[in-house]
Amino acid sequence: MATSGRLLCVCLVMGLVFESLGYLTGREKRPAENLEASVQRRWYLNRRYEVDCGGVLCQFGCCEDDRCRELGCEFMDVLSRIRSAE
């Protein structure tokens, strides 16, 4: 039991030493990288599949008779109105 207690103390001290030196752990590095990549991917996909549908931006394949159709196309219509108002 004493050996495991000493080992635990050594591990805690080593963790504090590395933290004070500024070494980043895997958990601290990955979320920011993953977040940035997912935001870029989402932006690219949204931009890539927007088409002009009678003056209204719709997702690709949503344009029918100069109006947006299918689920989610109304959201793109609202975004295009907000952008045109600016």
Curated annotation (Swiss-Prot):
One of its GO terms (cellular component) is extracellular region. Contains 3 disulfide bonds. The keyword Plastid does not apply. Residues 1-21 form the signal peptide. Keywords: Cleavage on pair of basic residues, Disulfide bond, Secreted, Signal, Toxin. The keyword Disulfide bond applies. Its main location: secreted. Residues 22-46 form a propeptide. It is found in: Secreted. Expressed by the venom duct. One of its GO terms (molecular function) is toxin activity. Belongs to the teretoxin M (TM) superfamily. The cysteine framework is VI/VII (C-C-CC-C-C). This is Teretoxin Tsu6.16. It comes from Terebra subulata (Chocolate spotted auger).
